[in-house]
Amino acid sequence: YCEVNGKPIRDGLSKKSECKHLPDLTNIGILAGHVDRWSNSSPSNFYKTALYDRAVELIPETKNYEIPDFKAKVVDGVYSSHNLACIRQMSNIGKVMNESVFWSASEMVYNHVVINLGDDLHIWEPLSIDQVLKGTDLTNPLNRKSSLGFPFSGQKKDDIVTGSYDKPVLKAWYANRIRMIIERMDKGLPPLNISTTALKDEIVKKGKNSRVFFSGNTEFLLLCRMYLAPLMELFMAKRDKLFAKIGMNAIGKEFDDMLQNMYAHVLKHATPDELKLFKSIVSDRLWIDGDYSKYDKLLVTLRYAIHIILWLAARTKHFKQNVLDFARLYLILKALHEYVVIIGQ
């Protein structure tokens, strides 16, 4: 438990969020003295209208939600800061006590993907930069209105692309930047996966203030699209058969179909007790919605997903014949769980 000038310090998002987990609090007084300083200090774009009271009448739960508040503040003597919330989240470190279970599950997923993709797996080849910018049959074109990310504060992706959406071209200075990164990768230097934190402008539950998300740098995004988008397309094309769900409609029968397919697969391997539990969860009701809470923060599990992708790449004709491309893919996947986060400004 920590105090500054007799006031408790916590991040305001959770009652369990006192700062006892922080190793160094020498600068916390400076932070607490500038409660109005935050990069997203502008007000939310949401505002209440005359329809709000009507919405509460129809759906009483509406009153449990509110417009986000982006400013750090002191309420009832408690300093609430999104910076601290983000630090707390990033300080949570998981540890796998028995790795054999995860490796067995990874091997099962790998075999399942190989069986269902079959020879289609050999379609997987890196995209050209033109394909990345324009998009393909299943992937969207680059969103040129979104942030360019680190280190180009305040700039949009539109600042690095010229031409129409049908014929986009990277500007020369940025194309040279990508070329330089790839040349460094060929010397064994991984690309940098650098994210900056920002606050989501979305309606949130009362007491939560707002949500923090990570905005990645565009260079790394382009590399991920070049080398991983073709595999994601294969996953999407076979999403009715795979447990790897990209672009799945989470609301509706498709989610239930996924669970039923998983149930059918578990039938072959489960113990009687596991079957009884799984059947009670899946078979006796229709599931129309689902979410994996904070899955993107569980970097321990990401390690195994990365290995599955490497195993799949090692089977393909292209990556067998192009050792340099396989080495680049390895460095990109390695950077996926060795990222740098810049909190606030």
Regions found by a protein language model. Give the residues of each.
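Viral RNA-dependent RNA polymerase
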Residues: 1-345
